């Protein structure tokens, strides 16, 4: 005679892997064209000068320069790449 009731299968116990989202190049860092600046879902950060946005909202550099984050009115944060020659002046 069994002394334990039959155990039901658990409905928990699974999780998805992290998607490695976030800032990849921080403010002040030097980037080259094609470098990924941020991976995001939606537009947490918006593309500014010399920054493009991919179909999955990834922000990438279009020119060589220094990354700069700037908050604008309306609560939006724009990411720009300031060319090194301009930054030196």
UniProtKB/Swiss-Prot annotation:
<dbReference type="GO" id="GO:0006412">
    <property type="term" value="P:translation"/>
</dbReference>
<dbReference type="GO" id="GO:0022625">
    <property type="term" value="C:cytosolic large ribosomal subunit"/>
</dbReference>
<dbReference type="InterPro" id="IPR018261">
    <property type="entry name" value="Ribosomal_bL27_CS"/>
</dbReference>
<keyword id="KW-0689">Ribosomal protein</keyword>
<dbReference type="Pfam" id="PF01016">
    <property type="entry name" value="Ribosomal_L27"/>
</dbReference>
<dbReference type="InterPro" id="IPR001684">
    <property type="entry name" value="Ribosomal_bL27"/>
</dbReference>
<protein>
    <recommendedName>
        <fullName>Large ribosomal subunit protein bL27</fullName>
    </recommendedName>
</protein>
<keyword id="KW-0687">Ribonucleoprotein</keyword>
<comment type="similarity">
    <text>Belongs to the bacterial ribosomal protein bL27 family.</text>
</comment>
<dbReference type="GO" id="GO:0003735">
    <property type="term" value="F:structural constituent of ribosome"/>
</dbReference>
């Amino acid at each position: 005679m069994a002394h334990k009731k039959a155990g039901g299968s658990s409905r928990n116990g699974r999780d998805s892997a992290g998607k490695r989202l976030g800032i990849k190049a921080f403010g002040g860092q030097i980037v080259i064209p094609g470098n990924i600046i941020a991976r995001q879902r939606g537009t947490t950060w918006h593309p500014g000068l010399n920054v493009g946005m991919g179909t999955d909202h990834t922000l990438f550099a279009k020119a060589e320069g220094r990354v700069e984050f700037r908050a604008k009115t309306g609560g939006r944060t724009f990411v720009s790449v300031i060319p090194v020659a301009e930054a030196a002046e």
